[in-house]
From Swiss-Prot:
Entry GO MF terms: ATP binding; glutamate-tRNA ligase activity; tRNA binding
Upper lineage: Bacteria, Pseudomonadati, Campylobacterota, Epsilonproteobacteria, Campylobacterales
The protein, known as: GlutamylGlutaminyl-tRNA synthetase
UniProt motif 'HIGH' region: location: 6-16
Motif 'KMSKS' region, chain ranges: 232-236
GO cellular component assignments: cytosol
Residues that hold ATP according to the record: K235
Domain of life assignment: Bacteria
Catalysed reaction, written as an equation: tRNA(Glu) + L-glutamate + ATP = L-glutamyl-tRNA(Gln) + AMP + diphosphate
Broad class of where this protein is predominantly found: cytoplasm
Pfam family, one: tRNA-synt_1c
Organism: Helicobacter pylori (strain J99 / ATCC 700824) (Campylobacter pylori J99)
Any one GO biological process: glutamyl-tRNA aminoacylation
Family designation: Belongs to the class-I aminoacyl-tRNA synthetase family. Glutamate--tRNA ligase type 1 subfamily.
């Protein structure tokens, strides 16, 4: 079984979605069940509704799952596993207070050395601290694993100490709950971000202590860097939020296409998730950081907009009139996002705001003169744009840019865009909606 294990503590990050997509693809390729595990044991950081938001995003991306579990439902199992380790003398109670440990951390910092917990501290405050934590005994050997992307990764004994499994309130730590659940659900491969590399030896040690002889294969994905700063994209970067990208009018198909493409060797530029299942391979992923490029994502989104079928295009743009499909297709050629497309069609159909767009009083006057001339014309009477244009120029007594710029604004709501002869048939059939001024 493969799994995706998000925490409901904020907006879904593009790095997390990338991991979800890759786990889903490999599960399909290997014909294995796919598990979604909501890691909600950190009650203080959980945000109400974020779990549902995550699941909704996965559905939008075309990702389905065979099983959905909430990690908090397994807390009795986690405690049972901790008790097993205590009985087998593989774990121990630690009575050292948070204040004591903080002092030791500060001392290590001042001495410019890494902080490592010492087992001798476990009983120092036993008389005054009656709520101990449970720690796994530190290993006396190195822990190594062969990462599917990073190759061999090794942690020496002095890099690992006796770490906490259960907190004072008997709630499991992230690493303990994660390791226990991966055993419980027989997870065979974990694809996740490289920020989890330091967690991996701890989870391996927990699973070995619990008697696992069937090691999990790990693949740690390189981080995604911001295109401008070159730094890791954090939650503060709005483009790192999948929700933000969707709200900006990027299609789920395009986002998935992009996240599969970056840092990868792909056989074609534009593809669907189902197509990627046919050829995706972890071996083709680079071990170097991927660079986020919003401009390229916009290009891919433009290509996916063109691939939308008629019904989906009408649904996404909220247009009920099928006669406008051709116009939508013309507008798509100039749009990178669904938001831009919706804005163009809205400007076309809504009353025109010449007060907002006029450059000076003379320009406003020309707009009003041309508007009155157009109102007197029967749009359906002209066989083409050329004959319509000549009559409009005659009636308004305007020519050149004094004619064309006001004309474009009055007919499309925009000062530039698709050539007017191409959209004139749609202007003819919708002229009563098109030729209106905002009060």
């Amino acid at each position: 079984m493969l799994r995706f294990a998000p925490s409901p503590t904020g907006d879904m990050h593009i790095g997390n979605l990338r991991a979800a997509i890759f786990n889903y693809i490999v599960a399909k390729q290997q014909n294995k069940p796919f598990l979604i595990r909501i890691e909600d044991t950190d009650k203080e950081r959980n945000i109400e509704g974020k779990d549902r938001e995550i699941l909704e995003i996965l559905k939008l991306m075309g990702i389905s799952w065979d099983k959905l579990v909430y990690q908090s439902h397994n807390i009795d199992y986690h405690r049972e596993m901790a008790e097993k380790l205590l009985k087998e003398n593989k774990a121990f109670y630690c009575y050292a207070s948070a204040e004591f440990l903080e002092r030791e951390k500060e001392k290590a910092k001042n001495e410019k050395r890494p902080f490592r917990y010492l087992d001798e501290w476990a009983t120092l405050e036993k008389d005054k601290n009656h709520a101990p934590v449970v720690r796994l005994k530190a290993p006396n050997h190195a822990v190594s694993f062969n990462d599917a992307i990073k190759k061999e990764v090794k942690f020496e004994p002095d890099e690992l100490d006796s770490f906490v499994l259960l907190r004072q309130d008997k709630s499991p730590t992230y690493n303990f709950a994660c390791a226990c659940d991966d055993l419980l659900y027989e997870i065979s491969l974990i694809i996740r971000g490289e920020d989890h590399v330091s967690n991996t030896p701890k989870q391996i040690l927990i699973q070995q202590a619990l008697g696992s002889n069937d090691p999990i294969v790990y693949a740690h994905l390189p981080i995604i860097l911001d295109e401008t700063s070159g730094k890791k994209m954090s939650k503060r970067d709005e483009a790192s939020s999948v929700k933000w990208l969707l709200n900006q009018g990027f299609l789920p198909e395009a986002i998935a296409n992009y996240l599969i493409t970056i840092g990868n060797k792909v056989p074609k530029e534009v593809f669907s998730l189902d197509e990627a299942i046919e050829w995706f391979s972890l071996e083709n992923l680079s071990s170097s950081p991927a660079h986020f490029n919003l401009k390229y994502l916009k290009h891919l989104n433009h290509e996916h907009l063109k691939l939308l079928d008629d019904d989906k295009l009408l649904e996404l743009t909220l247009i009920k009139d099928k006669n406008l499909l051709g116009l939508l297709r013309l507008f798509i050629e100039e749009c990178g996002t669904l938001l831009e497309l919706k804005e163009k069609i809205s400007l076309f159909l809504e009353p025109k705001d010449i007060v907002k767009t006029y450059e000076n009083e003379d320009f406003k006057e020309r707009c009003l003169t041309l508007f009155n001339a157009l109102k007197s014309m029967d749009f359906q009477a002209y066989k083409d744009f050329e004959s319509f244009k000549k009559e409009a120029m005659r009636l308004s007594q305007l020519k050149g840019k004094d004619f064309f710029k006001p004309l474009r604004i009055l007919l499309t709501g925009n000062s530039h865009g698709v050539e007017l002869p191409l959209i004139f048939p749609y202007i003819q059939s919708h002229h009563q909606e098109v030729l209106r001024l905002k009060a």
